[in-house]
Amino acid sequence: MYKVADIFCGAGGLSYGFSMHPYFELIWANDIDKDAILSYQANHKKTQTILCDIMQLNCHNLPCVSIDILLGGPPCQSYSTLGKRKMDEKANLFKEYLRLLDLVKPKMFVFENVVGLMSMQKGQLFKQICNAFKERGYILEHAILNALDYGVPQIRERVFLVGALKSFKQKFHFPRPIKTHFSLKDALGDLPPIQSGENGDALGYLKNADNVFLEFVRNSKELSEHSSPKNNEKLIKIMQTLKDGQSKDDLPKNLRPKSGYTNTYAKMWWEKPAPTITRNFSTPSSSRCIHPRDSRALSIREGARLQSFPDNYKFCGSASAKRLQIGNAVPPLLSVALAHAVFDFLRGKNV
C-alpha cells in the first residue's frame, strides 16, 4: 500500500483516482479554503484533512510525515513573480511547495497546473521550476494532457509534471489517450430540461445510463444540484435567440451586449464536448456556458458532470463556492488514469 498526500487539494478531484485504486491510501490532504475542505471530508471520509495555510504545515501537525506520493500544485498566480527580487505572498506558495517536498521526501510527486505556466517569462520560469525539482534528486517527465482524451466530456488542457527519485531506473509513462470522446449530449442527455429560475431535482433522471460515461457518473438514485439561477428578461431573450455554438456577435443589434469577449453570452454545442469549465460556468457574461437546448446557463450538476464528478459527489458551501471547487478541479476521470500510470511505474511496468 502506497501512502498519498494532497496539498492544494480543493474538493478532491486529483485525489479521486488514487482513492479508488486498491494500492493507494490517502493519508492527509490540505487546503486553505474551508468549503473545499468540507467537500473533501464529505467524499474522502478516511483521509485526515488539515485546514490551514500551507505555510503552517510542519512535522508537528502532519498526521504522517513519511509519504510515498505527493499530489497537487500551487495556484497559477503563484509563479507570476517567481525569480524577481520582490516576491508577493502567492509567489511564496511555490517555495512552500518545495519546503513540503523536502519535509515529506516522497518517492514521487504529481504536479498540475495551467498550460500557460510553460510560456511564462519566455519559458524561463518553467525551467526554474524543473531545476528546483532536479536539485532535490528527482527525475522529471512532463506532458500536456487533455481531459477529453481520458473520458471527460470537456476540452481541458493542463500541464502535468511527474517527479520520481533517481533510485528508480525505469521511465514514467503518462497514460495513453482513449479513442472515444464524449459530447454534451452524451454527458447531460439524461437530465430533465429546466428553464431560468427552475429546479429540476424532483423531476429525476429522464432515462437509464446508455453510455460508459453515464454509467460512471450515475451512481446516485436521486438527482441533486440541478437548478438554474433566475435571469432577467433580456438575458433570457438572448439565450432563446442563440443557436448551437453562437455567441453575442451573432445576435441582432437590439439584443447584442455592448461589452464582453467573443466567447461570452455564447451557447455550447450539443453534439460536441464542452469547452473548458471554469468557476463561471453559470455566468453567461463571463464564459461560454449557455445550455444548447434550454434557455439558461449550466446547473451545478451539469458543471460537475462535465468535469466527470459522479452524481453522488458532495460539494459544500454557497452556490458560488461549489462552482469554484468544480471549476478549479482536476477531472476525476483524468485522475483515475494518472493513478494507474503512477502504480504501473512503481511496480516497474514499462507501459
Label each residue range with its predicted role.
Residues 207, 211-351:
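C-terminal target-recognition/interaction regions appended to catalytic cores
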Residues 59-67, 79-258:
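Class I S-adenosyl-L-methionine
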Residues 40:
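Conserved SAM-binding loop
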Residues 46-54:
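Conserved SAM-binding strand-loop segment of SAM-dependent methyltransferases
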Residues 4-13, 54, 64-82, 108-114, ...:
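Conserved proline-anchored active-site loop of SAM-dependent methyltransferases
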Residues 33:
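Conserved SAM/SAH-binding beta-strand->alpha-helix loop
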Residues 11-22:
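Conserved SAM-binding loop of SAM-dependent methyltransferases across substrates and taxa
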Residues 26-27:
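Short beta-strand element of Class I
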